[in-house]
Amino acid sequence: MRAIVLTYHSGNLAGNDYATNNLVALAEDLEQIHALGIPIVPLRSIVDALIAGAAAALPKTVAAITLDDGLDFDFVDLVHPFHGPQRSVRSILRSFSSRHGVAAHATTFVIASPDARRQIARREMLDHQWIGDHWWRAAVASGLFHVGNHSWDHLSPSVAQVQQREGKSGSFGFIDTFEDADLQVRAAREFIEAKAPNPGSALFACPYGEGSAYLVEQFFPLHLARHGTLAAFTGTPGVMHAASNRWLLPRNTCGTAWRTPDDLARLLRE
């Protein structure tokens, strides 16, 4: 198995071309993935195969689409105040599937805390509340999405009081005790699962693309029955394979791991 996990941020909107708009980039990238004959599969399917030791049951190369932060642009067509109408990821996936007659799927990793999301929207989105949870259940029901866990509050500097014992923010490496990890991982998963029951809630994407040694070496592997998480993803570029560490899985982020369609083509072929 060679699994390439691609990550987009639907709120990365500084224009309306590939370089400045992750929604535009996603639409183009789906076409390229299809042209290369690489199937797009749910991330949970890849994780299940990895854990079961059944990676050989998947096609030789597969791709998975992930989205970070859970902005409304993932599911709702919106008008951006500076860049105009934007097709949501849902609309992009539907159009792609209809055009090619193949399934498309994405896992959106969302921030659980409603209060944290409100503060992030107020400070980072000109108070446009584009980071709600009203669409999570509908996203799962559409068959196009799983809703995964991106922590309780992202340890975002935009949140006045993050759930970290010393109030530290800006790096998920600060999560290095059971109490903090339990809230950021378990409580977040349980909130998401209550809002939108789905297989993706058992997947965790570390905020800022980084975990801590405590999470990777102790909390995730030793407390699985409590936190209910099956795998954790970083933002480190790379390819998943049968020997990958399930608590330190790679993802390739649009705008850093690749910046152009040609970059992505090389990444997919390597």
Residue ranges and their predicted role:
Residues 1-66, 71-77, 157-270:
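C-terminal active-site subregion of NodB/CE4 polysaccharide deacetylases
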Residues 20-32, 80-91, 126-134:
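Aromatic- and glycine-enriched glycan-recognition loops and surfaces
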Residues 34, 54-57, 93-103, 128-149, ...:
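Acidic (Asp/Glu)-rich catalytic clusters
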Residues 67, 80, 149:
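Single, functionally critical "micro-switch" positions that shape active/binding sites
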Residues 76-99, 103-109:
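A short alpha/beta connector and helix-capping loop motif
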Residues 108-166, 170-171, 177-178:
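Active-site cradle of extracellular carbohydrate-active enzymes
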